[in-house]
């Protein structure tokens, strides 16, 4: 058998394996239309270190303040993009170049959800490419409301703490539906690195960021908002500097 033929066979096998993998991911995404995930890749790994705190809550059982705060913190253009925020990516690249090191990420809520549900946190081109493919599947297969609901239920909010309900209970001893604007902003300020940015910790960055998030809440659109009134939107300001990778 010639080298060329072996190479073609290898490439054909690689294509088949890659296609089957994408079909598996697609099946998992389509299942999310009507079924809540039992766990996530991040929770599965965390369970090896002990019990994971997580209680599922439907979209309407989570405070609109938290939805607004999370979008302000992580993805202000969530309702407008199709999985990728090119403006956010350009802004992150600019900040990283100015700092000479990674200090900002450009991942959307959808991309973060893809990573949290199915992938690892390793920074490789292969993982980022797979994340992009799954993000497209999520955007095509699910509504914005459903994507945000899923994210709020699987996002990490501290050691072994996953989802809005577990976070609200752990930090404030209340349900996710009862979170105030300040409490919601404090939780959102911890994302996406809650083990580094704990608002009860010694750093001033999280408290400053929480204040900024709370001030910006009225500026963001959320899917299917409730009837809770918000104050008039303030003038947009720049967020405090910090590592948001």
From Swiss-Prot:
Which class of enzymes does this protein belong to? transferase
The protein's matches in InterPro entries, at most eight in alphabetical order, are given as:
Glyco_trans_51, Lysozyme-like_dom_sf, PBP_transglycosylase, Pep_trsgly
Its transmembrane ranges are 10-30
A GO MF term: peptidoglycan glycosyltransferase activity
Give the keywords, sorted: Cell inner membrane, Cell membrane, Cell shape, Cell wall biogenesis/degradation, Glycosyltransferase, Membrane, Peptidoglycan synthesis, Transferase, Transmembrane, Transmembrane helix
The record's subcellular locations are: Cell inner membrane
Region Disordered: list its residue ranges. Answer: 224-245
* Catalytic activity annotation: [GlcNAc-(1->4)-Mur2Ac(oyl-L-Ala-gamma-D-Glu-L-Lys-D-Ala-D-Ala)](n)-di-trans,octa-cis-undecaprenyl diphosphate + beta-D-GlcNAc-(1->4)-Mur2Ac(oyl-L-Ala-gamma-D-Glu-L-Lys-D-Ala-D-Ala)-di-trans,octa-cis-undecaprenyl diphosphate = [GlcNAc-(1->4)-Mur2Ac(oyl-L-Ala-gamma-D-Glu-L-Lys-D-Ala-D-Ala)](n+1)-di-trans,octa-cis-undecaprenyl diphosphate + di-trans,octa-cis-undecaprenyl diphosphate + H(+)
Short name of one Pfam family: Transgly
Composition bias of kind Pro residues appears in 226-239
EC annotation from Swiss-Prot or TrEMBL:
2.4.99.28
Give the CC-aspect GO terms.
Answer: peptidoglycan-based cell wall; plasma membrane
Q: How does it sit in the membrane?
A: Single-pass membrane protein
Q: In which pathway does it act?
A: Cell wall biogenesis; peptidoglycan biosynthesis
Superkingdom assignment: Bacteria
Task: Quote the function comment for this protein.
Answer: Peptidoglycan polymerase that catalyzes glycan chain elongation from lipid-linked precursors.
The family note in this entry says: Belongs to the glycosyltransferase 51 family.
- In Swiss-Prot or TrEMBL terms, this protein is called Biosynthetic peptidoglycan transglycosylase
What is the scientific name of the source organism? Alcanivorax borkumensis (strain ATCC 700651 / DSM 11573 / NCIMB 13689 / SK2)
